[in-house]
Amino acid sequence: MIRIKDIPQVALRTALFALLKDGQSCDVFGDVPERAALPYITLGAMTFRPVGNKTAVIWQATAGIEVWADGNQQQEMNDILNDICVLFSYYGADLEIEGYHIIGTELESVETWPESVTGYHGTVTVQFTLQKGKVQQ
């Protein structure tokens, strides 16, 4: 078994945050300000599972991209979720994730539901297979 020295959580978060900031017209927050105007996007839960072999550190990672909207913004939320899926399908495989190479990407799921505090909540879950270092060509 190869020794794991880091988890690509910060690098993946940074790359996703940059993609969303550049590709969305609504606000994207790491830490949501107290009186933030809806709708907005946050990065949600992430999971990392090592799937490497004897010679490579490989991670299977999922990331939740959260959209929050008020009770009158269901259509806006759906439009934002759609835009996120388009962004990911066009640019997800080309993200620069510091210290890692993207082996594969997949749009895993899109979910929406009424939310008691804000009005509506949606999540896009994306999946990455990441290999430590540069892949030999």
Each language-model region and where it sits:
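Low-complexity, acidic Ser/Thr/Pro/Gly-rich terminal tails and inter-domain linkers that flank the onset
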Residues: 38-46
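Short, charge-patterned binding micro-sites
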Residues: 34-35
